């Protein structure tokens, strides 16, 4: 695809070569993310961060990525603090705010809303999550993390074995990740969830139609024994009619160190898009996994900075100029990935 000036709305936009280009640029961003160097390549540019659903990691990560490239960030959070609460349309909001920004990242609870907004925007728009539909930058950073974890073991994305666990019906991160995985070869995917929260059939059929093996199960123990990656998700409480309805599914697929030791291969990598619900009755990753070296959830969040920096650099057509505007940092820094 042509990155310069483009919206990033869906992972369906990408071919394998596009993914490889994004990841190569992401690799080049490490010195800046590690605070070894500073670049001002986007000095004077403004990111409009528009988040109409709660967000910590995605919102702050996009803002941090833009700051690290030398740009400035302006934020709108929640409906109550925006003119949308007064009845303003997405069209009008897009026309106005795209006049204030050079690029916009938007999250909205309604599926398709970010694409609708982008049609009226005069600057590139990145989908930061639209309801239960897609979350392209999360899928990219997840895939980038998987590639790095496998590369450290002398493996590639081709031939990946992955188990996705939890609320696969409402989890937009796994929907986008399923589409991206289809660009690679010889995959084995196990989808583990209650029947009521199963992966939508369109994604299952997509991968099967591309020749990949996709198994569907509700048995956690028998699904995580021979995989490279366990990708856990939280119960998307905000997509249910009530907390009581969501509570029916909590704790059904909780992974802790004892289960990991008993059923997983020793080098199986554990991932999660975060936030994880650490309450004792929740559905996700136990805190006793925190010292497991194969727990990659915080490496994922670090990698999100790299991938989002790469997206900004490509969309604003400065990927080849970042180093020209750089210098060493003059403060103490000690960071690792």
Curated annotation (Swiss-Prot):
GO biological process, one term: amino acid metabolic process
GO cellular component terms listed in the entry, alphabetical order: cytosol
InterPro entries: Asp/Orn_carbamoyltranf_P-bd, Asp/Orn_carbamoylTrfase, Asp/Orn_carbamoylTrfase_sf, Asp_carbamoyltransf, Asp_carbamoyltransf_Asp/Orn-bd
Residues reported to bind carbamoyl phosphate: 57-58, 107, 135, 138, 274-275
Its EC number(s): 2.1.3.2
Pathway: Pyrimidine metabolism; UMP biosynthesis via de novo pathway; (S)-dihydroorotate from bicarbonate: step 2/3
Keywords per UniProt: Pyrimidine biosynthesis, Transferase
Residues in the signal sequence: none
Catalytic activity from the UniProt record: carbamoyl phosphate + L-aspartate = N-carbamoyl-L-aspartate + phosphate + H(+)
SUPFAM superfamilies, per the entry: Aspartate/ornithine carbamoyltransferase
Residues annotated to bind L-aspartate: 86, 172, 234
GO molecular function, one term: aspartate carbamoyltransferase activity
Function as written in the Swiss-Prot or TrEMBL entry: Catalyzes the condensation of carbamoyl phosphate and aspartate to form carbamoyl aspartate and inorganic phosphate, the committed step in the de novo pyrimidine nucleotide biosynthesis pathway.
PANTHER family (UniProt xref): ASPARTATE CARBAMOYLTRANSFERASE, ORNITHINE CARBAMOYLTRANSFERASE, MITOCHONDRIAL
Subunit structure comment from the entry: Heterododecamer (2C3:3R2) of six catalytic PyrB chains organized as two trimers (C3), and six regulatory PyrI chains organized as three dimers (R2).
Entry-linked NCBIfam families: asp_carb_tr, PRK00856.1, PRK08192.1
UniProt family annotation: Belongs to the aspartate/ornithine carbamoyltransferase superfamily. ATCase family.
Full protein name: Aspartate carbamoyltransferase catalytic subunit
